[in-house]
């Protein structure tokens, strides 16, 4: 399991109702269901990931996050999770507002493009970083917003 998911699984109380935005192959929801009796849904737009979720018995909805979460009532989830997807939506501020509307608690992870390793890679190689954690080349990536922790704190203050 990815390191960020291992941390997140500890933060989610047993029996919670969870919405996982950009749930990928359903790894987090599957683990939470099996170990913490969590219920909920994953939202995903990649057909291969959706098929993997279905194979794992995960409740998954094919949905574009940029279209919002209007199909969910306010406060309908205990926790809304978005891991490694904020940088891939066109309007991060809108999805943050929607997350806060439908969930009592929100957990977000994203690649910190201001991390020293990213800056070092860029400075020494003259290229955007490519690694196990950032596996895409700049021209073939879903990452359209490159933010740092400072950037995220700023948008968070504006939308909380």
Label each PLM-derived region with a short phrase.
Residues 79-91:
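A short SAM/SAH-binding and catalytic strip from SAM-dependent methyltransferases
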Residues 93-101, 105-159:
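S-adenosyl-L-methionine-dependent methyltransferase catalytic module, highlighting the catalytic core
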Residues 68-74:
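Short conserved loop adjoining the S-adenosyl-L-methionine
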Residues 26-30:
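Glycine-rich SAM-binding Motif I of class I
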Residues 1-15:
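Conserved alpha-helix/loop element of class I SAM-dependent methyltransferases that forms part
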Residues 22-24:
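Class I SAM-dependent methyltransferase "Motif I" SAM/SAH-binding loop
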Residues 31-68:
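Class I SAM-dependent methyltransferase SAM/SAH-binding core
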